[in-house]
Amino acid sequence: MTSAGVFNAGSDERANSRDEEYPCSSEVSPSTESSCSNFINIKVGLLEQFLLYKFKMKQRILKEDMLKIVNPRYQNQFAEIHRRASEHIEVVFAVDLKEVNPTCHLYDLVSKLKLPNNGRIHVGKVLPKTGLLMTFLVVIFLKGNCANKEDTWKFLDMMQIYDGKKYYIYGEPRKLITQDFVRLTYLEYHQVPCSYPAHYQFLWGPRAYTETSKMKVLEYLAKVNDIAPGAFSSQYEEALQDEEESPSQRCSRNWHYCSGQDCLRAKFSSFSQPY
């Protein structure tokens, strides 16, 4: 799926013309299954682009409009196409497609976190930044609740998000992460205690503890990887324990734990340096 997510009227016409080439019929054969799979993939991608365009333009999302994109003749496949498109948008952008008015079948893409402007942060016709923030929270959790700057930038490199470059969705990543996410208190970014020379690390901020939890973040990671949350056994146990505490208790405990561990590591490192 392209990040731009731009839809135009011509796309619907071209896709509908391809329906004749890739029909899903009741006849079962290898060629029919392949054609049906191709058809569904095309429609999933088209519906994703349509939904992201509606989000970007802050326009209403109606079921009847989604059916038009898929083509009303293929209502039998609509449920699967709708599910796959919404799930893919969820794992990429961390927004959920929700029916906000069942009477008129009105839908909206809702950010998993309460970032300003429904995940956009800044005013304008832009796409949500929630996916990058959720990914950062995952990395911090997997790194023992505090992740050093070098590890986080290496992870972003793996996602082909590079420091110093400007991106259509995220703008300048360093500014978004170290300024916007920190200013909104979803992340904390500060010098590692007792470190010399100075090293810097990321922790969850108070707002992250209030609006989400380790279990929810782990469930998001599991969905991205299409596995059960329990597959991350040690993190799953930690997430279960955290469910019994308040957000402020979790925030305080993890901050003190990371500070103590980092100070010990820094002292050990200084003793091990050759003279």
From Swiss-Prot:
It comes from the Eukaryota. Residues 23-33 have a biased composition (Low complexity). GO terms for biological process: negative regulation of transcription by RNA polymerase II. Keywords: Tumor antigen. Residues 11-21 have a biased composition (Basic and acidic residues). The keyword Transmembrane helix does not apply. Signal peptide: none annotated. Residues 40-239 form the MAGE domain. This is Melanoma-associated antigen B5. It comes from Homo sapiens. The gene is MAGEB5.
